Amino acid sequence: MNRRANPRYLAVVTLNRLEESEDFLKDLVDSQIQRSSLSSLDQGLYTELVFGTVRMRRSLDYALSRFSSRPLEKIQPAVLNVLRIAAYQIFYLDRIPPSAAVNEAVKLARAFGHEGTAKFTNGLLRQLLRGRDLLAYPSLEEDPVEHIGLKYSFPTWIVEQWIKWWGVEETAGLCAAMNEPPRLNIRVNTLKSSPEEVRAHLQSRGISVQSGRYLPEILEVRPAHAVVADDWLEEGRYYIQDESSALAAHALQVEPGQTVYDLCSAPGGKATHLAQLMDNQGQILAFDVSSRRLAVVQENAQRLGISIIRTQVGDATEDLGLSPVPRVLVDAPCSGLGTMGHRPDIRWRKSADEIRQLVAIQKQILSRAASYVAPGGLLLYTTCTLTKWENDEVVQWFLAEHPHFSGQPFPEEFPGGPGQPWERTLFPHRHFVDGFYMALFRK
């Protein structure tokens, strides 16, 4: 077995590393591909196996546990990952014959274990093949939390909260949408190109291009990986950004010549979009606690041909000593649950306790931001998550604590809902973008 060129072997290696480290899954995958000898075709299979197995981990473990002669926690972690990858192919990859998935898994179990683990793997997977059509989830009517959690592979606590906030039907639709193949949006940099030029360029390279749903500068491209090696991306003619995030810059209603504060800026997607909408005229002060992350903001601005962004290291929970300006953006640190379609590892790494700690930080930042807004100015609060703890409840608290601010209604055509006129929640199954939240205030 040439391990550096075997997508299944490398998938197991990556899953093992994910469990042993705090690195993001995407970073582990990118690093592994760079070190491997995988063909372009096998890179696609490797990526599908890793992301798919992580995404559907709870569902896969449920299926494996029904046919295993021993508890899953008693199985060697690497061998359990072999079993998960094989089960993922059996349940979700029609193009791979089940027998091939089993045979390859047996080889991997031998490589990561011994002859005994190979025999155990063979027996378990063949039982799963024989009984998979009889596998059943708890009833949706009798136990909706377990049904949705097991069917769509989500932690119980997330499903419980979403059902509490939005009901069973909405939660099932939301979870299903989070498991769909993620689309890729790009934002055309109108300082350098037009949407028509970028569309024609990408189509000439055999890339499928569709218009965004809400914004003229957004395009949707398939396959997603096709733009990574494109010269136009390096030249700054476009920027990879989900349409939900791009809506934020429009919500702030900036004008050329204004001064804008972006208090949690890195990696700079919203700051560079604001500069684009300001026609590169005015000033944007971009803050972040990390100088390393601010360097990424500077690199992105330079590549996009933007000269009005100035970066400054600063902790937005503390007083930055800033003079009031017409526009302030708080893209708050959050749990990121709205991005689980692109980042499936998030669902297994976040907890309700961690979110409660984030809420305290979000309130601190928003309170500090209030003092930087000039009378009549706008303050925009955004997150890429779907918890009312971090969204609606933070906003309700802010308005109660800061009576000199009021909610500023969004234009009626602005997508999102339900909520107050000054709030917009974007749902993947309703709006076909990443989960996102915005609240707009006027001082």
Per-region residue spans from a language model:
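S-adenosylmethionine
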Residues: 1-443
